[in-house]
């Protein structure tokens, strides 16, 4: 592709950073990507939970490498459109619609997705530097830069994709707002389906394995479990989102967990033995207990001089058990790369402000229902009280069927006109 002359420093090499680096490279920008972890295995949350890539993100990544990435993802296509809800006795009480069929929807292990995306970035020759600690950063009217491992690096802009505890947030957003504990945490892990086949207590999760993916919710007064099968019936992943007794003093970083930690909040459930059969099959040392952090609405994602922008969890961490967080991160990456392409080297601050305008309102609307849904899931009544239906919070078409790339090209000039005219940009593709 032709070079745009735009140079970009991407901070963070989780899914947000990797996707940003790839999208910027494909648009002809020069990219250096920095990651403090020593290698890919230590980046962010590379654990054995699952990631839902919905159609809005699948249409982006499946095209990479002339379809090679899509081919690699095919083994993880999500072919189920319904979720089953069980009560704490093990009785199925509800079926809810969760997705429309699509060839670009994937339910994949996080580590597998990260590896596929990273391998593609390597084939493109992107400059990715692990073990890089940023000690300082700055912006001027014509450039931005970082001091990393004793070296100064400069570029036309910095894209901060370094997660909920972003190093650049204070200066970029002009806010001291810090993530706080939500009052919830979740323990996550996975197991091989093959390891469950001889256990009679695990047969309930094996129904249809290899034919259709299973998605099961078990809400209760002390925890809300999500159990899914994926990869053509090869894997089962599970999550226990539980209430934290003292969130103000609770840990704010991930720690190793055990099967007993996972089971502790559900000791009184009659369904416990069947759940335990699945959880105990997880490889030793593979479970992680992670606090769910939340961040209020930032006043801005773009720095005062327009040379730095926050994307992904650095700007809008997905609340609680959102199934769409990773898909929105991929959209962010695609949009900022397109805006830099259209604006060109001489208008980088404008490009970042346009990208913010296009994404800001949409992300705000995406997150409105998620805290409410999570609270409802922990207030589902139990059989002895009369079952209260599990809340359905549909993934609206303007989210799952959105084409962020087409939309960015269509809206770019409108947003530029609004910014230059000092008017508010009004998004029309949300409801």
From Swiss-Prot:
Return the Gene3D superfamilies for the record. Answer: FAD/NAD(P)-binding domain
Q: In which pathway does it act?
A: Secondary metabolite biosynthesis
**Signal peptide residue numbers:** 1-21
Question: Which protein is depicted?
Answer: FAD-dependent monooxygenase nodY1
Keyword tags? FAD, Flavoprotein, Monooxygenase, Oxidoreductase, Signal
Similarity remark: Belongs to the paxM FAD-dependent monooxygenase family.
Q: Which cofactor does it need?
A: FAD
């Amino acid at each position: 592709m032709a070079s745009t002359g735009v140079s970009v420093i991407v901070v963070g090499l989780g899914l947000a950073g990797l996707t940003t680096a790839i999208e910027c490279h494909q648009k002809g920008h020069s990219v250096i990507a920095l990651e403090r972890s020593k290698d890919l295995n230590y980046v962010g949350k590379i654990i054995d939970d699952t990631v839902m890539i919905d159609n809005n993100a699948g249409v982006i990544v499946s095209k990479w490498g002339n379809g090679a990435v899509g081919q690699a993802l095919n083994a993880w296509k999500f072919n189920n459109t319904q979720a089953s809800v069980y009560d704490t006795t093990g009785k199925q009480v509800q079926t809810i619609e969760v997705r429309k069929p699509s060839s670009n929807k994937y339910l994949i292990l996080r580590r597998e997705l990260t590896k596929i995306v990273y391998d593609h970035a390597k084939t493109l020759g992107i400059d990715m530097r692990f073990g890089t600690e940023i000690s300082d950063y700055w912006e001027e009217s014509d450039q931005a830069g970082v001091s990393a491992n004793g070296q100064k690096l400069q570029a036309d802009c910095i894209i901060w994709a370094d997660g909920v505890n972003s190093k650049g947030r204070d200066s970029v957003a002009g806010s001291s707002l810090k993530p706080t504990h939500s009052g919830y945490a979740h323990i996550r892990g996975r197991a091989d389906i093959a390891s469950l086949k001889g256990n009679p207590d695990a047969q309930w999760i094996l129904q249809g394995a290899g034919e259709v993916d299973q998605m099961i919710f078990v809400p209760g007064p002390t925890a809300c479990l999500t159990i899914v099968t994926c990869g053509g019936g090869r894997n089962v992943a599970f999550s226990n989102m539980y209430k934290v007794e003292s969130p103000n003093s609770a840990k704010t970083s991930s720690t190793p967990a055990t099967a007993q930690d996972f089971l502790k909040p559900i000791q009184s459930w009659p369904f416990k033995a069947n759940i335990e059969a699945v959880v105990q099959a997880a490889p030793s040392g593979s479970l992680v207990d992670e606090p769910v952090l939340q961040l209020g609405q930032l006043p801005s994602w773009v720095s005062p001089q327009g040379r730095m922008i926050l994307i992904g969890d650095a700007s809008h961490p997905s609340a609680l058990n959102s199934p769409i967080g990773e898909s929105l991160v991929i959209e962010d990456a695609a949009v900022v790369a397109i805006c830099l392409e259209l604006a060109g080297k001489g208008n980088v601050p404008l490009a970042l402000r346009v990208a913010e305008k296009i994404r800001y309102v949409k992300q705000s609307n995406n997150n409105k229902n998620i805290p409410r849904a999570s609270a409802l899931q922990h207030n589902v009544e139990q059989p002895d009280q009369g079952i209260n239906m599990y809340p359905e919070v549909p993934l609206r078409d303007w989210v799952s069927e959105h084409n962020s790339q087409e939309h960015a090209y269509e809206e770019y000039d409108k947003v530029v006109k609004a910014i230059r005219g000092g008017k508010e940009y009004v998004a029309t593709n949300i409801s």
